Structures are given as structure tokens and as C-alpha cells.
Amino acid sequence: MTNSNNDFVGVLEADLNGQDLRIGIVQARFNEEHCVALSTACITELLALGVTQADIKLVTVPGALEIPFALQKLAATGEFDGLVALGAVIRGETYHFELVSNESAAGITRISIDSGLPIANGVLTCETDEQASVRVNLKGADCAKAVVEMANLALALTPDFDIEVNAGEE
């Protein structure tokens, strides 16, 4: 009989309950048709997971390279449990596609690590409009699930210093 590691250690299970979570979304407007579809799918799934409409804030920016700046500003407010980055970068005839894709992803990751705030990266990088159209609904919903799960994980792994500091004090 084999045992998995789960038999011997405490496991934090994925928590997709969005109740009481505050989620910020930064959506690029470049390739707007795809970006609006991404945000619509994301918001629809957030609502289905229990995040209230009042607890969702949507900010739009010109393009994918502007997403990290807006994420950083939202993270700095301390008002959010998680953030979502949404955009669509579609290959053209120049090297610009690689630059935008790589720099946007690096900036999103850096903001998440530096702020300690989970950020679901839903910036599509596709070869064609058709590829983007096929992916937007699933990617938007996946980002909603990812940000809710990671926000709950972050909350579960964050010590409650007030309780520890004030324990035993009257």
C-alpha cells in the first residue's frame, strides 16, 4: 500500500470561494475586442465564485506595456486581495510582439513579487486574431479562478499579527 505525502502533512486545499475578496482588474484597450471579451469572462466567473460586483474594480490602460504601472498603483492602495492583468498581444511583422509580450509579463510578475499580492496574468500572446478569439473566454474565466485561489492562499499563509501581539493583553 502506498501513501501520498498528503497522508503525512497538512495540506491547504484550493479555495475558490470569492466571498469578501476585493479584486482589481487592469485591462488593456489595444486589441479591444479581445480584451473586452477577456474582462467580461473574468468578471462573470468572479461573480459566479462569490465576489460581489461592488468588490470588483476595473481599470483600463492603453496597452499591455501600461498594465504593470496600473497594477503597481492598485497594489499600493492596500485595498485589494488580488489583481488580474488582461490584454491581447498579437504577432505582427516586427520584433515588437516579443518586446511587448516579454516586458509585460516580467512587469506583472515583478509587481506581484514586490507587493506580495497575487496577480493572475491573462495577457494573451497569440499569433493571430483567430487564436485570440478562441482563447479569450477560457483565459478570462481561468484568471478569475486563479486570482481567487491565490488570494485565499495568501490570506491563509499570512500570519494574523494582531492576534499574536494582543494575545493575553486586557
Curated annotation (Swiss-Prot):
GO terms for molecular function: 6,7-dimethyl-8-ribityllumazine synthase activity. The keyword Iron does not apply. It catalyses: (2S)-2-hydroxy-3-oxobutyl phosphate + 5-amino-6-(D-ribitylamino)uracil = 6,7-dimethyl-8-(1-D-ribityl)lumazine + phosphate + 2 H2O + H(+). The active site is at residue 96. GO terms for cellular component: cytosol; riboflavin synthase complex. Its EC number is 2.5.1.78. GO terms for biological process: riboflavin biosynthetic process. It comes from the Bacteria. (2S)-2-hydroxy-3-oxobutyl phosphate binds at residues 93-94, 135. InterPro entries: LS (IPR034964), LS/RS (IPR002180), LS/RS_sf (IPR036467). Pathway: Cofactor biosynthesis; riboflavin biosynthesis; riboflavin from 2-hydroxy-3-oxobutyl phosphate and 5-amino-6-(D-ribitylamino)uracil: step 1/2. It is an enzyme of class 2 (transferase). 5-amino-6-(D-ribitylamino)uracil binds at residues 30, 64-66, 88-90, 121. Keywords: Riboflavin biosynthesis, Transferase. The keyword Transferase applies. PANTHER family: 6,7-DIMETHYL-8-RIBITYLLUMAZINE SYNTHASE, 6,7-DIMETHYL-8-RIBITYLLUMAZINE SYNTHASE DMRL SYNTHASE LUMAZINE SYNTHASE. Catalyzes the formation of 6,7-dimethyl-8-ribityllumazine by condensation of 5-amino-6-(D-ribitylamino)uracil with 3,4-dihydroxy-2-butanone 4-phosphate. This is the penultimate step in the biosynthesis of riboflavin. Belongs to the DMRL synthase family. This is 6,7-dimethyl-8-ribityllumazine synthase.
